[in-house]
Amino acid sequence: MQANTPRPRCPDCNRPTSHCLCPLISPQPSATQLLVIQHPDESRHALNTARLLTLGLDNAQLLVCEELPPEWQAWLTDPHWQTRLLFPRPDAQPLDSRSCPAPLRLVLLDGTWRKARKLLHVNPLLQQLPAVLLDNPPTSRYRLRKASEAGALSTIEAAAEALATLEPGFERERLLRPFEALINDQISAMGDDVWQRNYR
């Protein structure tokens, strides 16, 4: 019996080539530098929004790890930059130009809440960064995951809101275009009945 042949995938967005999202990705600039630290378990997830996020920005990088490599520890402590962690810690300040003065580096953690907290736990340097949070975040469009915490957003949604808050003229919808297509494609694949029964 012949084994199933894996479907070819786009090397950039990592989607099956028949469902490649790259035509919807239009990278845009930002004065804010973004670092997305992704838990390794999340990198294998089909709905990987961190990859779409970093493809959609000229000034963003994706780091897949649990413990930060030494070179990234130096990046986080560069005295020429103001570095903030976008995470709803109890001491987090509302994100705005006062809590995030330029030149700014913004760090986001990508994973489930449990995995994100593990990233914080094993990296004391992340714990030491001043934390900021989104003030009155919108309802998530991530209709395929049930968040365990109120106001939770996917990584790409959180970044879009943060940059729209910090930088006048930033095109939030331009960044979210492939994300919307990804969600709609997954709902179409599972069928509306299944989606209604499990996610509505």
Question: Where do the model's predicted regions map?
Answer:
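Short Cys/His-rich "knuckle" micro-motifs
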Residues: 18-24
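S-adenosyl-L-methionine/SAH cofactor-binding core of RNA-modifying enzymes
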Residues: 55-121, 125
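C-terminal folded domains that constitute the principal catalytic or ligand-binding module
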Residues: 114, 122-200
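Short microdomains enriched in Cys/His and/or Lys/Arg
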Residues: 24-50
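Short, flexible, mixed-charge glycine/proline-rich loop motifs
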Residues: 1-4
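Residues immediately within or flanking Cys/His clusters that coordinate Zn2+
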Residues: 7, 17
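Short cysteine-rich clusters marking metal-coordination/redox-active sites
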Residues: 10-13
